[in-house]
Amino acid sequence: MKITVLGAGSWGTTLAVLLAGKGASVRLWAHRPEFARELEASHENVRYLPGVTIPDSIRIEDDIVRAVQGASIIVTAVPSQALRETLALFRDVSLSDTIIVNVAKGIELDTGKRLSEVIPEVLPAVSPAQVAVLYGPSHAEEVSDKQPTTVVAASSCLETAEKVQEAFHTSMFRVYVNTDIIGVEIAGSVKNIIAIAAGISDGIGYGDNAKAAIITRGLAEMSRLAVSLGGEPMTVSGLSGIGDLVVTCLSRHSRNRYLGEQIGKGRSLEEVISHMNMVAEGVSTTKAVFSLSSRLGVDMPITSAVYEMLFENKPAEQAILDLMTREPKKELGY
């Protein structure tokens, strides 16, 4: 099977190595030609995944059209806000039988669309039934170290989800399937916002009670938005929801939690981003989801608080106080 991975960051590299280990013919596309040459020469992604060997069997590409031609599966592992422009680079390639698997988590900022909606919009030869996402609690560092990991392949077409499951499943990378792609995508995207909130709590110096409250009430926000868009409420109880939410809010590997922690310590958003070498998807997702939830009339107070802290310079402790002093409500219900 020929599989192309677009994006040579930590996650794209990890998945390329995993797929090559299963015997697939893998091409890994890097956006910058000089970076592609660096990967090819060193057989290691020193910038984003140091210590992991890229096997000789993986073909490094800097020409995206050449990279995707003839692929049975194309994995998009580029930042969410770069997806549309990346897809446009090969929109004229014949893809009638190709499955597109998106692994980036986010909502498109300008349109409020899920990334699985963007793909067939940009690639006219690709139907929604050919599109899948692969989400779940899966830090690249642990997957590349062959630590046990479980994820979910979601598509509106069960057959597509099952093909993705077959392509990626290993003894240490267990893949489940789900046809609720809406719920899976919303859960996987909103969790990055909640992780920023959890990090802010850490940065202020709050303890376990506050973190548990953020995770639990964040799950409620995730569910409300997913259901309002046609997703299933049970999906947020799965791997893309509570699974990814817990790991992202607690892990030292989480970029979004780290960014929030620095905000909680009083650093500006611009300062924190300038010192990060990888994208924290939660920043753009906060802006996109804040706009989307406002338009839909979905109550998402934690998301709103994170938006105010990131983009309106609201002091973190004041934002937390405002959350705590809102009108008392019932715990359950939408």
Swiss-Prot record:
For this protein, the record's Pfam families field holds: NAD_Gly3P_dh_C, NAD_Gly3P_dh_N
Where does this polypeptide localize? Cytoplasm
- Gene Ontology terms describing biological process: carbohydrate metabolic process; glycerol-3-phosphate biosynthetic process; glycerol-3-phosphate catabolic process; glycerophospholipid metabolic process; phospholipid biosynthetic process
Q: What is its main location?
A: cytoplasm
Its UniProt pathway annotation is:
Membrane lipid metabolism; glycerophospholipid metabolism
Q: Which UniProt keywords apply?
A: Cytoplasm, Lipid biosynthesis, Lipid metabolism, NAD, NADP, Nucleotide-binding, Oxidoreductase, Phospholipid biosynthesis, Phospholipid metabolism
Is Lipid biosynthesis included in the keywords of this UniProt record?
yes
Q: What is this protein called?
A: Glycerol-3-phosphate dehydrogenase [NAD(P)+]
What this chain does, per the entry, is described as: Catalyzes the reduction of the glycolytic intermediate dihydroxyacetone phosphate (DHAP) to sn-glycerol 3-phosphate (G3P), the key precursor for phospholipid synthesis.
EC class name: oxidoreductase
Keyword Cell membrane in record: no
